[in-house]
């Protein structure tokens, strides 16, 4: 599985996630604006953090 792993609005980068079945994108807002984090897996998130998990290559941009 290949997942995007760039932060927020940086240029897209990807990494190969061996053994993973999900990519994730999570986002929240703070004083800097909207923060977006992407990577492998499907983490648990705190209340107030939005999470989208998906199962295809590069699905989490």
UniProtKB/Swiss-Prot annotation:
Q: Where does the entry annotate site (May be the main cause for the toxicity difference between this toxin and cobrotoxin-b)?
A: 56
Q: Could you tell me which cysteines form disulfide bridges?
A: 3-23, 17-40, 42-53, 54-59
So which tissues is this one expressed in?
Expressed by the venom gland.
Q: Which GO terms describe its cellular component?
A: extracellular region
Q: Which locations, inside or outside the cell, does it occupy?
A: Secreted
Which keywords accompany this UniProt record? Disulfide bond, Ion channel impairing toxin, Neurotoxin, Postsynaptic neurotoxin, Secreted, Toxin
Cross-referenced InterPro entries: Snake_3FTx, Snake_toxin-like_sf, Snake_toxin_con_site, Toxin_cobra-type
Signal sequence annotation: none
Q: Where is this protein chiefly located? A: secreted
What Gene Ontology molecular function terms does this protein carry? ion channel regulator activity; toxin activity
Q: Which Gene3D superfamilies match?
A: CD59
Top-rank taxon of the source lineage equals: Eukaryota
What family does the database annotate?
Answer: Belongs to the three-finger toxin family. Short-chain subfamily. Type I alpha-neurotoxin sub-subfamily.
Q: What else is known?
A: It inhibits muscle contraction with an IC(50) of 0.20 ug/ml.
> What is known about what this protein does?
Produces peripheral paralysis by blocking neuromuscular transmission at the postsynaptic site. Binds to the nicotinic acetylcholine receptor.
- According to UniProt, the name of this protein is Cobrotoxin-c
**What organism does this protein naturally occur in?**
Naja kaouthia (Monocled cobra)
- Taxonomic lineage from the root: Eukaryota, Metazoa, Chordata, Craniata, Vertebrata
